[in-house]
Curated annotation (Swiss-Prot):
The keyword Disulfide bond does not apply. One of its GO terms (cellular component) is extracellular region. It is found in: Secreted. It comes from Tityus serrulatus. GO terms for biological process: killing of cells of another organism. Coiled coil: none annotated. This is Cryptide TyPep-18. Keywords: Cytolysis, Secreted. The keyword DNA repair does not apply. It comes from the Eukaryota. Causes weak hemolysis. Does not cause mast cell degranulation, LDH release, and does not have antimicrobial activity. Does not cause edema and pain. Expressed by the venom gland.
Amino acid sequence: ILPNDK
């Protein structure tokens, strides 16, 4: 999961 994945 990427930090930009909301």
